[in-house]
Amino acid sequence: PRGPLRPLCRPINATLAAQNZACPVCITFTTSICAGYCPSMVRVLPAALPPVPZPVCTYRQLRFASIRLPGCPPGVNPMVSFPVALSCHCGPCRLSSSDCGPGRAQPLACNRSPRPGL
C-alpha cells in the first residue's frame, strides 16, 4: 500500500525572518518547525452534532532559541526569540503556539532587504 502524497507531520528545517521596526536590519535564520499532513475525518451525518475539530501539525516538544538583530539603536531590545521543534504531533490547534491558518505559498520573509551573510 502507498502512503499519503504529502509527508506526515514531523519537524522540518525552515528559513524564517526576524525583524524589529525600530532596527535597521532584517535577518533570516534556519530553525525546525512542525509541518506535514494530519489525517482527519468528516462526519457523514453532520446535522445535529458539533463540528469535529481538524487536527493540525503542531509542537509536541519545543525549546526556544534567540538571535540578536544587529544595528538596533540604544534602548531597543535586539533579541528575538523563536521556537525550535524537537518533536511534533497531530492535535488541536492552539493559537498560543501555532499558526492555524492555511499554509503559505512563501515562507515568512523580510519586509526590507535581509542582511547578507546571516
Swiss-Prot record:
Disulfide bonds listed in the record: C9-C57, C23-C72, C26-C110, C34-C88, C38-C90, C93-C100
Subcellular location: Secreted
One Pfam family here: Cys_knot
Residues with glycosylation annotation: N13
GO CC terms of this entry: cytoplasm; extracellular space
Keyword list, A-Z: Disulfide bond, Glycoprotein, Hormone, Secreted
Gene Ontology terms: biological process: G protein-coupled receptor signaling pathway
GO molecular function: hormone activity
Function of the molecule: Promotes spermatogenesis and ovulation by stimulating the testes and ovaries to synthesize steroids.
Protein family (similarity comment): Belongs to the glycoprotein hormones subunit beta family.
Subunit structure: Heterodimer of a common alpha chain and a unique beta chain which confers biological specificity to thyrotropin, lutropin, follitropin and gonadotropin.
Protein name, as recorded: Lutropin subunit beta
